[in-house]
C-alpha cells in the first residue's frame, strides 16, 4: 500500500463493517473479491478498523454448502496471512480479481459478470475479521438482509460499507471514504462511482468504455447539482449506521406488490 494510504488509515478511529450481501452467487468469485479487498486493507495497515461480513440469502443448498466451504478457506487465509495459498477454484478467482481489480485499476470497480449468529468464528491477521451468516428466510430480499445485519450487529459499528456481489474496491478508496465520513459528522452516506471491469462481450465492452469516458463527468455533475444531498445507489457506499437505523426503516405498503 502507498505511504499516503497507510497514513490515512492510521488516523481512523471508527469501526467499519464491509457488507457483501449474496443470493445464489458463485461463491469462489465472491470470496476472491473479498480476499483481494482484505489483503489490500491489511497491507494498508487498516485491518484493525474493518470487519468483513458475508451476508447470504442463498436458497440453493449446493451453493450454500459451497459458500461455507470456501468461506472457511478464506478464513484460514486471512487468519494466517498466507495470501497466494488458495486452492483450486478459489486460486483462479483470486488471481483474476487481483490482476484486473485491486492492484491493476487503483479504483473502485464492478465486474460485469441461518447459520446462527456469526457462524464459525473469525479470521484475523492484522485485526481483520471475516464473518459468514446465512438467513433461513430471505425476508425483504437485499434490504431485509441489510436490516438483519443492523438489528444483530449494527450497534457494534460506526459505519458500514455496502457492496454488491460483484463489487471490488481498493483499500485506498475504502480508507479515504471512511476517513471522510469520520471527519464529517453530519454526513450520512458517502458513495463511490462504480466502473465496469473484465467485460468480454461487445456490448459490455462498449458499456465499459462509455463508463470510463463519461463516468467521471457524470459523477462530477451529480456532485455539483445535488451538492450535499444524493440518492443511495445501493452499493459501494459508506453509511453511518446509527443514522441509518434511526431514519431509514420504511413501512410495508398496503396492497399488491407491483
Feature roles, as predicted:
Residues 2-101, 106-110, 117-258:
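Internal catalytic domains of large membrane-associated glycosyltransferases
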Amino acid at each position: 500500500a502507498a505511504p499516503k494510504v497507510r497514513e490515512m488509515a492510521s488516523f481512523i478511529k471508527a469501526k467499519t463493517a464491509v457488507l457483501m450481501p449474496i443470493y445464489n452467487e458463485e461463491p469462489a468469485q465472491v470470496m476472491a473479491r473479498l480476499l483481494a479487498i482484505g489483503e489490500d486493507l491489511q497491507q494498508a495497515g487498516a485491518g484493525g478498523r474493518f470487519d468483513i461480513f458475508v451476508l447470504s440469502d442463498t436458497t440453493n443448498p449446493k451453493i450454500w454448502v459451497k459458500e461455507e466451504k470456501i468461506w472457511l478457506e478464506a478464513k484460514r487465509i486471512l487468519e494466517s496471512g498466507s495470501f497466494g495459498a488458495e486452492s483450486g477454484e478459489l486460486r483462479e478467482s483470486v488471481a483474476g480479481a487481483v490482476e484486473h481489480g485491486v492492484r491493476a485499476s487503483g479504483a473502485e470497480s464492478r465486474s460485469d459478470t441461518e447459520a446462527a449468529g456469526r457462524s464459525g468464528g473469525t479470521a484475523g491477521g492484522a485485526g481483520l475479521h471475516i464473518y459468514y451468516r446465512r438467513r433461513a428466510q430471505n425476508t425483504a430480499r437485499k434490504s431485509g438482509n441489510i436490516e438483519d445485519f443492523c438489528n444483530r450487529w449494527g450497534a457494534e459499528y460506526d459505519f458500514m460499507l455496502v457492496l454488491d456481489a460483484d463489487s471490488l474496491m481498493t483499500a485506498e478508496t475504502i480508507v479515504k471514504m471512511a476517513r471522510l465520513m469520520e471527519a464529517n459528522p453530519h454526513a450520512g452516506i458517502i458513495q463511490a462511482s462504480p466502473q465496469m471491469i473484465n467485460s468480454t462481450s461487445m456490448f459490455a465492452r462498449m458499456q465499459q468504455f462509455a463508463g470510463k469516458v463519461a463516468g467521471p463527468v457524470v459523477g462530477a455533475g451529480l456532485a455539483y447539482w445535488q451538492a450535499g444531498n444524493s440518492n443511495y445507489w445501493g452499493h459501494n457506499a459508506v453509511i453511518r449506521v446509527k443514522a441509518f437505523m434511526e431514519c431509514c426503516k420504511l413501512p410495508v405498503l398496503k396492497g399488491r406488490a407491483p
